[in-house]
């Protein structure tokens, strides 16, 4: 993994629960004690930029492999939570005064520990988290302006590297990507894939507070239409089959259990 720091996360999890940055062997040993379920370790990418890139295969490539592989349906920027000091108020007070962070004040205060009582200097930026997850305080905004031919080509190549146990290609999902800058992202350079979410992922740009509810629903409906089209193409080609009601129920129960941890 290239040495510490490294990332530890539950093998089955959601909303950033159980994710930690481990700085040394002692941190890893403690994580093994604290985490009762199977977990994975991965290389740490410092960013500082993180985005979610939702990629969808063109349905015709299922039967016509020579066709262009897929396209970026949506992309969202992830703004990590922070407060800005005024030289008067403590970090705790700044959190409680913040129009957004006060809704998750309990989490931020617990995370900051004793540091919550420090008074940052005027204009000093204090990070409250470094995980690109809504539930961990990150704010998602639409990043359609980041989509370029270079980035699309790079994501196509990455998606092409995935195969299931039957040798079938990857069809749809969201890559959570870290990189050094938006400029590097547009060029498709120096990307670090921190997570890949499959069919149950979503176009997380729908959570942009500056976008309307109607726009969000239109984006989701478009996503579901693509899912339906791909499923139909797989079934027609014989490379896929519908799941049974029992399988659907088991998947739902697994999801609900993961969300309740």
Cite the ranges covered by each PLM segment:
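A short catalytic or substrate-binding loop motif that flags glycine-/basic-rich loops and adjacent residues
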Residues: 12-13, 45-48, 169-171
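Hydrophobic alpha-helical segments
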Residues: 158-165, 199-203
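Glycine-rich phosphate-binding loop of ATP-grasp-fold ATP-dependent ligases
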Residues: 5-28, 50-52
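Substrate-recognition/cap regions that form aromatic- and gly/pro-loop-enriched pockets
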Residues: 165-167, 171-178
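A short linear hydrophobic-aromatic micro-motif
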Residues: 4-8, 38-42, 174
């Amino acid at each position: 993994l290239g040495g510490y720091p490294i990332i530890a996360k539950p093998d089955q999890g959601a909303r950033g629960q159980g994710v930690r940055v481990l700085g040394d062997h002692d941190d890893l040993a403690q994580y093994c004690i604290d985490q009762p379920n199977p977990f994975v370790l991965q290389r740490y990418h410092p960013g500082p930029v993180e985005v979610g890139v939702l990629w969808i295969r063109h349905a015709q490539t299922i039967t016509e492999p020579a066709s262009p592989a897929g396209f970026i349906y949506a992309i969202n920027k992830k703004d990590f939570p922070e407060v800005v000091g005024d030289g008067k108020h403590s970090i705790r007070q700044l959190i409680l005064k913040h129009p957004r962070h006060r809704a998750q004040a309990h989490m931020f205060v617990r995370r900051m520990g004793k540091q919550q009582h420090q008074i940052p200097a005027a204009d000093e930026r204090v990070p409250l988290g470094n995980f690109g997850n809504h539930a961990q305080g990150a704010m998602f905004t639409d990043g359609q302006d980041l989509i370029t031919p270079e980035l699309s080509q790079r994501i196509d190549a990455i998606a092409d590297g995935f195969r299931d146990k039957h040798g079938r290609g990857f069809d749809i999902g969201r890559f959570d990507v870290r990189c050094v800058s938006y400029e590097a992202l547009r060029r498709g350079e120096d990307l670090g894939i921190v997570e890949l979410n499959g069919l149950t992922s979503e176009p997380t740009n729908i959570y942009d507070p500056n976008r309307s509810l109607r726009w969000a629903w239109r984006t989701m409906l478009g996503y579901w239409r693509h899912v339906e089209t791909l499923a139909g193409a797989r079934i027609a080609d014989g490379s896929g089959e519908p799941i049974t009601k029992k399988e659907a129920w088991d998947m739902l129960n697994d999801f609900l259990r993961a969300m309740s941890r």
